[in-house]
């Protein structure tokens, strides 16, 4: 029997997608209310059953293209059947700092009593005061409910797990475990790390950890996968805006260069706004040489290049590029220029379609993308440029501000020959 380990890694943005992780809407989204959705980074509550149907349609369309789609609830359910994995998660989630001294043992013993599928649901979906049986920590729980309310959370829900792109990012032969910008999202990295550490799909595979540790306080160093694109030719694009900081970007680049995994990191200096929270909300690849962009933001991007430099104390040098971001990206891939499809429609329509993730498409293979149906102007322009656009419904899935690119964490993707 072969003992050779499976190799995981993402080697381009437009090569054939082989394996991807997603997370279906579920209990966490049922917890969203008009009073808490802003804190949980959703613009509105969603019709959860319809969102589930639309997400299943998204998964089905990827599987029809031969892509191995892994769903996070399922992965977590299988992971926590390993007692060591369950202990690792609960030791970090059920603490006096997160739950309070009076309920740690009660909450933990109740969670440990659940069957794995239900437990995984609560780890992602959160635990409300009313979920815990009254017999568990009865007096303290009674006071907690009376003071904070029956719908207050002992463990907050994680509805943004729907956007698996951000929590970790696979860059060539390894992965980053991202310290997220908003507190509402930081526990997502813990759960994904547990999957990578203990689930057989990953525990028996070969890959590097480039950066990040959920056991560590990273301070001002934050990174989210929507900003990170390994585009091929040894190049990585990283957006530096609202969510990903220069502190994290420098450390990722240093790690990649030290292992010879990348030859250049192009930093895209973005304006700090929710509409352009990540690089992939204004720029994404649709083919080996074709990108879709929101020009109002992309033309303002300030590009910097980081390259290995053994003579530097930090092993790299940095310079501000004189050319535009699109010119720098094209040059890094050995292309004369990129074919560019801008957000469609007049100025009003283009702003609406960018807000509705018109430029946030995921490439399944060269020239084939998945995008939201509502972005009709942009989708039409992509089709005229020769791109096959597979559409999914945006009515519910888009309320968290993320499209096909945001809702996928590629784990294995083929390189492109530039």
UniProtKB/Swiss-Prot annotation:
Primary enzyme class: hydrolase
Active site: residue positions: 406 (amidino-cysteine intermediate)
Control of this protein's activity: Activated by Mg(2+) or Mn(2+) and strongly inhibited by Zn(2+).
Main localization (coarse): cytoplasm
Top-level lineage group: Bacteria
Family: Belongs to the arginine deiminase family.
Protein known as: Arginine deiminase
Biological source species: Pseudomonas aeruginosa (strain ATCC 15692 / DSM 22644 / CIP 104116 / JCM 14847 / LMG 12228 / 1C / PRS 101 / PAO1)
Origin organism lineage: Bacteria, Pseudomonadati, Pseudomonadota, Gammaproteobacteria, Pseudomonadales
Gene: arcA
